[in-house]
Each structure stands twice: as C-alpha cells, then as structure tokens.
Amino acid sequence: MDRIQSPSFKSKINFIPYGQFSKMNKINLIKFDHQHPNILKADKFWSANIRSCTGGGIVGKNEASGYHIWDDEANFDGIKNIIGNITNSVKEPVSALVIGAKDIKEAPRSMPIFTKIRNAMNRNVPNVSVFQAIKEDFGQIHYAYNRKDDIWYLCCEKVNPKNGNSIPAVRGIKSLQNFFSKISIAPTDRLFIKGKEVLPKDCPEIFK
C-alpha cells in the first residue's frame, strides 16, 4: 500500500457532472441520519444529497475529516457540541470546506446551522472555502474527498420533482454562481469546473 503524503495545502475543488461522480471509486459514506456517524475521519470519504443540510470537511497536515449535518431540531439544539466535534476531529487544521443549506421558510434551521458551522470554521481554520445556500428549490450537492491527491469533488444537481430525474446544474462559472447565493474561495484553494481551472482573473468576486 502506498503511503499517503501530506497534502499540498492548496486543495483543488473540482465540480464534475453526476456521470463522472457516480463512477468514482468512493468509500466511507457519511450519512446525515442519527443512526450513523455524521462526522468521519478518513483519507477518503464522501456524502450525498446535501440540500438544506450542511456538509464539508477539514484538512489537516496529516489527516482529514468530513461531515454531513442534518438541519433537524436535535442538531439545532446540539449544534455547539457538533461544532466542537467537527473542529476537534483534525489536529493542526490547514483548510476547510463548507457547503449546502437553503435559505427558505420550509427549512428554518438550515441557515442558522450553516452559519454557525461556517463561522466556527473561519475562527479555527486558516483557509476556508464556502459554497453557501443552494438557490434551486430542488437543488442538491454531493461531494467526495481524497487526501492522497488533496482534491474535493463536488457535483451539483437539479432534481425534476415530477420524475426524479437529475439535471446537471453546473456547466461553467455563471451557472455555478447561479446555483449558490454566496461563494468564497480561500487563497490556498484552486477552483475547477469539469477539469478546467477558474482563475481569480476570471471571476475575482469569489476569490478572497
């Protein structure tokens, strides 16, 4: 088995279509329900169907962890402990990713939970990239992380409520900006859409 090297600390965030995401060799699924761990430390992990939930992860010098936090009443009431468990899951954190949530009346706890997690990441981690508040009513995001390559793979979808079919949501920088209410890319991160890098000069408003 190859020994995993420390990450470069310039993480790649790569938005890919669902067809590519579904074929990836993914292990260590992080689920949102209370019957399974919602925070997981591993070299590879992934999570799916983040809608009004908050997802993401933390990368340290020698370890990484991911999370998927449901916006239910129990998590809302226990968010302080949840945040502590997330921030303590990795020693010497270098970068973090926070994604998801919806700013809608049907999910009143979604943005408060997201905001508290985002603020905690900003306090405890030097470099944080944020993809905040999915605009699409039936939008969702999946993610996977591989510490060996230090790459976050993100997949955004619109789901047809009539037949459940998936519609690709991100084809370029404009559609990415239309999918989220706010995007902020950390100085240590690089953004890619379908393998093509988006440089700060291409969209300066989203780069810190």
Language-model segments: residues:
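Short glycine-rich phosphate-binding loop at a beta-alpha junction
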Residues: 92-100
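Phosphate-centric recognition/catalysis
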Residues: 16-48
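Non-Sec secretion/translocation targeting segments of pathogen effectors
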Residues: 1-13, 24, 206-208
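Secondary-structure boundary elements
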Residues: 87-92, 122-126
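Conserved mixed alpha/beta catalytic, RNA-binding, or beta-rich assembly cores of soluble enzyme
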Residues: 42-89
